[in-house]
């Protein structure tokens, strides 16, 4: 990883991005079982794979905190998937974001993934593209309203 000394700072900035996504994806429909499922998966991954292998105190706090926001973003995106094609693509983007960040954690703390950088960056960029489509839909709706 390039600039690993700045990993925690980067995590803070990505947490801010997750807050923005959560705000954009709203809390309707609620669909709590999606949130519970994501929470269980992230909790198991953190407690079994990541946290036992991290010694840095900041990261021991940062990973769970960031995971709460990442999981909430995924929940909110997946909860809207039945609203249309753009929402389905946005949900897929959220899943890819979870995969990308999951690979970062696994690669850092549990197992050095072969071709990790390629996997992480390709899933991240595709996730961003798919999530961005939801903003394009909002812009299109605004144009129609005017």
What are these regions (language model features)?
Residues 1-146:
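Polytopic alpha-helical membrane-helix bundles and their juxtamembrane interface segments
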